[in-house]
């Protein structure tokens, strides 16, 4: 018995026992699904991927929309956005590596993490720009935002 026949059989004989390399029959994994569609292929796996991707991206939308409309960033913590961008960037890289290894798998997660990271970068860039403009004007960020982006409240009609 030579080495290549051992690899082709999927069973290595070691002493009195055997090491099984092809465990798909024992784990209930259907190899044709994995080859055709990628991972995860179980309906619950796809459901959780879709819902998770929507929730992750949807969590950033309200903050991004609010900042883009009001241009006010004085209440945003720089550290939180730096950590958020770093985490989302690493998760996006991980997800895209999963997509490259297994086409079809993790594509929604990869898109969600990438879009969330881009949205976070936009908000962070606005925060840094406002902070730099305020410093150049010799003001605090709050004073700068109050001067250039006043909060306009509609008064009730009499």
Swiss-Prot record:
It is a multi-pass membrane protein. This is Uncharacterized protein UU008. The keyword Cell division does not apply. To U.parvum UU007, UU041 and UU042. One of its GO terms (cellular component) is plasma membrane. Disulfide bonds: none annotated. It comes from Ureaplasma parvum serovar 3 (strain ATCC 700970). Keywords: Cell membrane, Membrane, Transmembrane, Transmembrane helix. It is found in: Cell membrane. Its main location: membrane. The chain crosses the membrane at residues 45-65, 76-96, 106-126. It comes from the Bacteria.
